[in-house]
A protein has these predicted regions:
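Alpha-helical repeat/alpha-solenoid scaffolds of the HEAT/ARM/MIF4G superfamily
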Residues: 124-250
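Non-membrane alpha-helical segments in proteins
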Residues: 1, 21, 191-202, 260-267
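Long, acidic and serine/threonine-rich low-complexity regions
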Residues: 435-438
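Elongated alpha-helical scaffolds that mediate protein-protein interactions in large eukaryotic proteins
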Residues: 1-48, 54-67, 73-95, 109-114, ...
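A eukaryote-biased sequence property
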Residues: 259-263, 303, 307, 311, ...
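Short, surface-exposed polybasic-aromatic patches that bind anionic ligands, especially phosphate groups
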Residues: 383
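Blade-edge beta-strand/turn elements of extracellular beta-propeller
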Residues: 49-50, 99-102
Length: 456
């Protein structure tokens, strides 16, 4: 009941302050897990009230509301997200949009702008990337600006903060004798950087959807805005690559901040594989060596680059670039490890990208000079394992095609002479190829039937 009455309190009144303090106490106590539907609806009402305060007030309560909103909405996989998505009214979304505009457009300390950008990331996480470019307005809201200006405002604000953080983190890591920052301060900057990277990744996805015509009908973003956004993203990715170059120059290849940098580079190059081509080509071998804090060997750094690799290897030059430093071995190793993820389902999307990359290289192996080596035996076993987890024709045919290409490099006698490959594995390989041929025959028969049926 309190939340529904807040909108009736006079702006800046003592009642608003007291209500806000009460909500602050609740926010730090409440957890949405295992809540009843009624209580979740109450939390959703709290979010609605906080969104209104965040939008319309210009006192300290505005920023308290911002902090409470980010605390509530940043909880991962919270049932509250579902309750908010099912709300019939979108006014709360527009209030949050208005509050974000107000914070980003005015002279506000960097920490509050970071909170506003975190809130934007939370909204895109809960409601989808297209939230940023949907045309929502609230009557009598002076903070309303066009969708295009809002998209660019959020992106440019994020870009500025990323540039500052990259510089500060690099200085604290590589100029430690001149830096007075504590480890906690550096860790906080790295966490903030990860949040901003996540926001920019979502913007990349939104821009990609809008430019390809796959966005929601409510998107009204203009082509000129898309081009401005792409120009800005190019500049930011170039800065991220410079950050990675600094790490390479200082012999640093382990760290979650470096892995996060690789991830955002991979996300952008998935959409524009030849952007920043010179810097990327120079750094690709180093990127493949980067490890997260909890990794004992590189894995995710290669996996994040697979969408780009599957595209550049369609050309002979791209294949030569990858093979020149043994990058194809890293891709094969990544594929093998994806089939060994204990307790988790195999990510078919990443597997297809890895297979496409290897198939592209194998197709151009005469120009790439790829000899038969033991790691190909491990690749065969991984493909057999992958195909054995499903009846999906796409998996069976892709795995079979790549196995066949590998076998063209060698002979049955050589394969059986390898200690890790026995007659049982060879039978499994034969069964896979037979399954693939049955799939081809089935599709051929169906195609013939449909063709004849069309002439009937």
């Amino acid at each position: 009941m309190l939340f529904s009455q807040i909108s009736n309190f006079p702006d800046g009144s003592r009642c608003v302050e007291l209500a806000t303090h009460l909500m602050k106490l609740l926010v730090h106590k409440l957890r949405a897990e295992n809540m009843s539907v009624e209580k979740l609806q109450g939390m959703a009402s709290m979010v609605t009230s906080l969104a209104m305060l965040f939008d319309v007030l210009h006192t300290a309560v505005k920023f308290e509301s911002l902090h409470m909103l980010t605390a509530l909405l940043s909880q991962k996989e919270s049932p509250l997200h579902g309750a908010l998505r099912s709300m019939p009214s979108t006014i709360w979304e527009s209030h949050i949009r208005g509050g974000i505009i107000d914070v980003l457009q005015n002279r506000v300390v960097s920490s509050e702008k970071l909170q506003a950008l975190l809130l934007a990331e939370c909204m895109m996480s809960i409601l989808g990337e297209n939230w940023l470019s949907e045309d929502h307005t609230v009557l009598n809201n002076k903070n309303v600006i066009s969708v295009d200006k809002f998209v660019l405002l959020v992106l440019e604000s994020a870009r500025v903060e990323v540039a500052v953080l990259l510089n500060e983190i690099a200085f604290s890591k590589y100029e430690s004798s001149k830096s007075s920052q504590t480890d906690d301060a550096i860790s906080q900057k790295q966490r903030n950087l990860a949040i901003l990277f996540s926001l920019i990744e979502r913007i990349i996805k939104m821009i990609s959807d809008a430019s390809s015509g796959e966005g929601e009908p409510s998107q009204t973003i203009q082509e000129r805005t898309i081009m401005q956004a792409i120009t800005g993203l190019n500049e930011t990715i170039s800065l991220v690559l410079d950050f990675l170059q600094d790490a390479k120059d200082h012999g640093q290849r382990k760290g979650d901040d470096l892995l996060a940098a690789v991830r955002i580079v991979g996300s952008y190059l998935a959409e524009t594989p030849y952007a920043c081509q010179e810097k990327t080509g120079r750094l690709l071998e180093f990127i493949f060596s980067i490890e997260g804090e909890d990794e004992s060997r590189p894995f995710y750094s290669v996996r994040f680059m697979l969408p780009m690799l599957s595209q550049i290897t369609t050309t002979a030059d791209g294949c030569r670039t990858l093979v020149s430093f043994g990058g194809h071995k890293a891709v094969i190793d990544c594929l093998i490890n994806m089939t060994k993820q204990n307790g988790t389902m195999i990510d078919n999307g990443s597997m297809f990208l890895a297979c496409d990359t290897i198939i592209n290289i194998m197709s151009k192996r005469k120009s790439s000079h790829i000899p038969m080596e033991p790691y190909f035996i491990c690749l065969l076993q991984a493909l057999i394992t992958w195909a054995g987890t499903t009846d999906a024709s796409s998996v069976i045919m892709t795995a079979s095609s790549l196995c066949t290409m590998v076998m063209e490099l060698t002979s049955e006698e050589f394969v059986l002479s390898c200690s890790d490959f026995d007659s049982k594995t060879l039978r499994s390989l034969s069964d896979l190829i037979v399954r693939s041929l049955h799939q081809v025959r089935f599709f051929y028969t169906m195609n013939m039937f449909l063709t004849l049926d069309g002439f009937a």
